[in-house]
Amino acid sequence: MKIVVYSKPNCPWCVKVKELMNRLHLSYDEKILDVDYTRDELRELVGEHLPLTVPQVFINDRRIGGYEEFADWCDNHGYGNE
């Protein structure tokens, strides 16, 4: 399973989603705003119609969403999110 997290510095929700992944022992690649990607590149990935927020989590190139959506995904796929 390939997990990519699009984040930015000083983002509390980004920290929270990475802490959850670490607790669940899920490996992920992190892409940091203005280092690894631009806002325009992220907008292309998430779609023009969606608010541009971080974190954005992708699993196997499929957009899951932000922290809440990822936590729900974990629950629905047997990972729990304790």
Label the model's feature ranges.
Residues 1-31:
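Local sequence-structure signature of Cys/Sec-based thiol-disulfide redox active-site neighborhoods
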Residues 12, 37, 65:
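Short alpha-helical
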Residues 15, 40, 72:
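Alpha-helical elements of the RecA-like P-loop NTPase motor core of helicases
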Residues 33-51:
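Thioredoxin-like thiol-disulfide oxidoreductase module
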Residues 47-58, 67-68:
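Structural micro-motif
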Residues 59-82:
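Non-catalytic, surface beta->alpha helical segment in thiol-disulfide oxidoreductase systems
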